Design a protein with these regions (language model features):
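A structured phosphate/pyrophosphate-recognition subdomain
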Residues: 1-46, 50-56, 70-73, 84-87, ...
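Glycine-rich, acidic loop segments that terminate in or are immediately followed by a histidine
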Residues: 46-159
Length: 159
């Protein structure tokens, strides 16, 4: 935060150089995340695509990578995408992304995650916006999450 503040205040020396370095690292991590998912592939469920990055993609950028997969050609825009990544506290961070077209068809990822996490219980938490949302679950809840989330989306999207 200090770096960003100093750059906004006009620093074009040390802090600007640091900001450029941080930006380059961020772009590198995104590029590597996209390449990893192109290599590993994305799985397809009835109502969504998903991938489990484990700890290979930082949980802080896994949602960005998920959204970028639409533009990279790795997935079509006909279903939302769900991304799993390990969080530092040994929980699983879930990031979901949709498209404007899916929103027009009734998609609400925030609601779907909230409902799914309520059914999972055991400290699962989720919510967000129609087009992008997130959740945190225990690692042993991934399979149940996929099934419940699939059912939740079936009740939303209409052709």
């Amino acid at each position: 935060a200090e770096t960003a503040l100093e750059v906004c205040m006009g620093d074009r020396g040390e802090y600007y150089a640091r900001a450029l370095s941080l930006l380059a690292e961020h772009r590198k991590q995104l590029r590597e995340g996209i390449e990893l998912m192109h290599d590993k592939g994305v799985e397809e469920m009835e109502t969504f695509y998903f991938f489990d990055a484990g700890s290979e993609i930082k949980d802080s950028i896994v949602g960005i990578v998920a959204g970028m997969l639409y533009g990279s050609g790795a997935i079509q825009g006909n279903k939302p995408i769900v991304a799993f990544a390990m969080h530092e506290d040994n929980t699983v961070k879930i990031s979901t992304r949709g498209t404007s077209e899916l929103i027009r068809k009734g998609l609400n990822l925030g609601l779907a995650l909230k409902e799914t996490c309520a059914k999972l219980g055991d400290n699962a938490q989720g919510g967000g916006h129609k087009i992008a949302a997130g959740a945190k679950i225990n690692e042993n809840q991934k399979e149940d999450f996929l099934k419940i989330f699939n059912e939740s989306l079936k009740n939303q999207i209409t052709d």
